[in-house]
Amino acid sequence: MRKYFPEADTQLSEAVLRLAVALDLPALQIRIGSLLEEAVSRPYEVALYPVPNWKLKSGYLVDQALLLSIVRQESIFNERARSRRGARGLMQLMPRTATFIDGEQRYHRNGNADLLYEPQLNVELGQRYL
């Protein structure tokens, strides 16, 4: 899809955007929204500021808009984002920090750091850290 998208017309792009919203794919929404905004010179807020349907175990302890703005800034909603220093996931948590927040799970040992790529877990730990 990424291969063909740059050549897509506006109607097709808007259809793909609606599909990305329906399938809860916020990173794709932002990418399409940015390209559409450039193509037609008008903002696509629904795409540029997505509201994913994440079910957090403890609910939202921090304002949802604040959390989503941090996720947008840190990872652009890329669940597999990883910094050069080793921060992982949507909120760019370091494995040792996640271990400190959780208190039980050891994210910095035995390959457990990859658990931080799971969106709900990453956002849950991130909001607890805030």
Where are these regions (language model features)?
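Catalytic glycan-binding domains that act on GlcNAc-containing polysaccharides
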Residues: 1-130
